[in-house]
């Protein structure tokens, strides 16, 4: 009765919901119900809301993840509208280099990238985190304005967050 694509979508949704619930619990936030599937009011956009942050969470079983700059722009827009800090989290959920990473909007001196996305490899990010707590830094252009992004491990993000 159910096709493979329906089962796959349901399992992806359950996979994402499990990630969101776990992170929301750890951060003391609330999960946005069916955030990717409904046209919710903008105050609930984003996967997780805390008192000070609005988070968008992505998860993959692949060893590669494509970060779309449009996703960064959306979470920034939703967060700032409600006076919250935008946080974009992506997770490599399987494989030798599984880990979570957080993108924060921070100034930097990088030249703006011209592409619309960035491909991350779990192995590359894992190696980079051994060298520095700041795993990656870049700039992209959003509606004519350059936005600096810093990528940290989720563990380091928790340290930053708890020291504020």
Labelled PLM ranges:
Residues 1-164:
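Catalytic phosphate/metal-binding cores of nucleic-acid and nucleotide-processing enzymes, i.e., regions
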């Amino acid at each position: 009765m159910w096709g493979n694509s329906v089962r796959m979508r349901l399992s992806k949704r359950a996979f994402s919901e499990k990630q969101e619930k776990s992170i929301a619990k750890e951060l003391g936030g609330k999960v946005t119900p069916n955030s990717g599937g409904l046209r919710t009011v903008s105050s609930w956009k984003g996967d997780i809301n805390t008192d000070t942050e609005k988070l968008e969470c992505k998860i993959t079983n692949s060893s590669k993840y494509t970060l779309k700059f449009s996703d960064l722009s959306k979470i920034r827009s939703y967060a700032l509208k409600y006076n919250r800090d935008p946080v974009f989290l992506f997770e490599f959920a399987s494989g030798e280099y599984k880990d979570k990473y957080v993108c924060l909007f921070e100034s930097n001196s990088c030249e703006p990238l011209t592409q619309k996305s960035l491909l991350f490899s779990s192995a590359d990010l894992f190696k980079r985190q051994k060298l520095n707590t700041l795993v990656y830094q870049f700039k992209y252009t959003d509606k004519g304005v350059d936005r600096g992004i810093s990528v940290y491990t989720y563990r380091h993000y928790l340290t930053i967050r708890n020291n504020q």
